[in-house]
């Protein structure tokens, strides 16, 4: 598997997590929608499924890890940034094969692509604190 396949899986997963957060739809329906309606060429489908399903099933646990580092309530965090931080927190917590620097860098790049103007700074700050606490 190429790193670019995982990068594409993360990119698709963040979009799917965002959609799931806003719609409240069943995660299986969101997964099906993204796999059938999006371009999945070069995407590590298994990794996409793991990230999406993992964030959905571990949402409460991930939010407990993230919340101490927020300066505002979780429900006030930008939905794009929330999706990115949840995805990265999942990787940092449950995918020990992914180096923490890779998980953080990928999250920053996703925030630059999808987030608000300074969203990447917010994401970086939260994840740096999370890594420092869990190392």
From Swiss-Prot:
Cellular component aspect of the GO annotation: cytosol
SUPFAM superfamilies reported in the protein's UniProt record: NusB-like (SSF48013)
Coiled coil: none
Biological processes per GO annotation: DNA-templated transcription termination; transcription antitermination
Keyword Magnesium: no
Entries under CDD domains matching the protein: Terminator_NusB (cd00619)
Classification via Pfam families: NusB
InterPro entries recorded: NusB-like_sf, NusB_fam, NusB_RsmB_TIM44
Protein family: Belongs to the NusB family.
Gene3D superfamilies: NusB-like (1.10.940.10)
Signal peptide: none
Keyword Transcription regulation: yes
Function: Involved in transcription antitermination. Required for transcription of ribosomal RNA (rRNA) genes. Binds specifically to the boxA antiterminator sequence of the ribosomal RNA (rrn) operons.
Domain of life: Bacteria
Keyword annotations of the record: RNA-binding, Transcription, Transcription antitermination, Transcription regulation
Source species: Shewanella piezotolerans (strain WP3 / JCM 13877)
Protein name: Transcription antitermination protein NusB
Gene Ontology molecular-function annotations: RNA binding
